[in-house]
């Protein structure tokens, strides 16, 4: 951890709740590093914010597909500008309307959609917060959860993320992250290098983001358009 004589930045540490973490190991590491800002447990059960569950599932899918989050979403949304239908590719076993309606069932249903549900949620979340917050959370998560042995390639990826969002005066610098990343003399290394920084950034995502997404025009207009199209086809 990078320590400085000036601790004024600690005033910016938000009140952290268990719902801001995906696992207990993250809570333990946070409490170890910030004993004066320990995680508050509101309930007996560890219930993570719905939006973090969705982002986690997106990151895991990206790892499985072996493609970077930013590149994949950029490609999908770029194609959508030319042809909205390009977002919605799936087997004919389930209709587009059925899939979009299923997004209301649970965060898992939204994340599992191959019709573009997760991409639209990411777009909505960036509008609510910032591109930097969402991209850092996803990229640091993919780095953390990729099951590869420590090595030069992994260290290079950690350095890339660090240089992109944390180091010095980088264009996409996120305030205070430098104090929350575990950096040795060799640089940012190790699976948990971004574990506290990721949790900190996650606090910027509103607890009710998933619910707001389902009430937002970005979703409601899409559902209306698809429902209208289905009606016309059946006439």
UniProtKB/Swiss-Prot annotation:
Q: Return the InterPro entries for the record.
A: RGS, RGS_sf, RGS_subdom1/3, RGS_subdomain_2
UniProt GO BP: negative regulation of signal transduction
Every copy of the RGS domain together lies at 107-223
Q: Which UniProt keywords apply?
A: Signal transduction inhibitor
Pfam families, alphabetically?
Answer: RGS
Q: What is this protein called?
A: Regulator of G-protein signaling rgs-9
Supply the source organism for this entry.
Caenorhabditis elegans
Gene it is expressed from: rgs-9
């Amino acid at each position: 951890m990078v320590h400085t004589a000036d601790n004024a930045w600690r005033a910016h540490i938000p009140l952290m709740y268990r719902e801001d973490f995906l696992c207990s190991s993250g809570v333990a590491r946070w409490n170890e590093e910030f004993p004066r800002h320990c995680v508050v447990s509101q309930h007996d059960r560890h219930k993570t914010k719905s939006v973090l569950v969705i982002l986690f599932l997106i990151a895991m899918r990206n790892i499985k597909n072996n493609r970077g989050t930013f590149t994949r979403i950029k490609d999908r949304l770029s194609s959508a500008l030319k042809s909205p239908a390009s977002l919605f590719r799936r087997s004919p076993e389930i209709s587009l309307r059925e899939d979009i309606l299923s997004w209301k069932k649970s965060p898992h249903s939204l994340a599992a959609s191959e019709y573009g549900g997760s991409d639209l949620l990411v777009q909505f979340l960036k509008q609510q917060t910032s591109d930097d917050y969402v991209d850092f959370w996803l990229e640091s998560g993919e780095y953390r959860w990729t099951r590869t042995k420590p090595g030069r390639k992994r260290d290079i990826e950690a350095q890339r993320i660090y240089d992109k969002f944390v180091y010095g005066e980088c264009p996409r610098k996120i305030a205070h992250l430098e104090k929350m990343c575990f950096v040795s003399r060799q640089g940012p290394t190790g699976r948990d290098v971004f574990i506290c920084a990721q949790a900190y950034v996650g606090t910027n995502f509103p607890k009710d983001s998933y619910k707001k997404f389902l009430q937002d025009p970005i979703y409601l207009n899409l559902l209306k358009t698809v429902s209208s199209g289905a009606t016309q086809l059946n006439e």
